[in-house]
Amino acid sequence: MIIIIGASKGIGKFLLHKFRSESITVVGTFNSASDNSDNLFKVDVTDFNQITAFIETQKPLLSEITLINCAGITYNAFAHKSDPALWKNVIDVNLIGTYNCIRAVLPLMRLQKFGRIINFSSVVATKPTAGVSAYAASKSALWGMSKSLAQENAGLNITINNINLGYSELGMIKKVPQEFLDTLIGQIPSKKLCEPIDIYKTVNYLMECNYINGSSIDLNGGLV
């Protein structure tokens, strides 16, 4: 069973449709934006009680669980002009929300002695970019958290890994002005954005491989 957190748009929606097209059982969540044509479950990842309630409703179906954490937001502002509440909200969604989802499924994974957890980090976690301190902090923190959790659970056939995504054709990039996008692509050694199918292949690889654990895979076209 695959659980995709944040499946109403972007990477999460693409993965949801891709897995379903292959007749794989997958459930997804949304929070703020969905017409619910994909039969998603409304869950606020910052609310641990909502997460546990959602997992409880799915419990009869949950075996050989893969949890894919795609929910994420950003807030662009220079620190000296930033709104502390909006800055904190990025941490709450991207980091605390990911923790909440992992925390909710780990007991069941440990009981079943199987689990695959895949988190989406970002190239901005290591590549300095002005104006995205909240996003960079949230994605950097995923690295340390995932490594620690991998140590705790590796002996029970549970793997926890990150995909450090560069700039892809999905999600937030669609809001970027074309002129800026052209400049951005010019800075990527492969001279193109990441294609959705490459994200799927990387996710699938981490699902199938049981010896990669506590790792962060760079999927960035050579952008370092």
Question: Language-model features: where?
Answer:
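C-terminal substrate-recognition "lid" of short-chain dehydrogenase/reductases
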Residues: 192-219
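Active-site helix of classical SDR
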Residues: 102, 138, 146
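N-terminal Rossmann NAD(P)H-binding glycine-rich loop of SDR-like oxidoreductase domains
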Residues: 8, 16
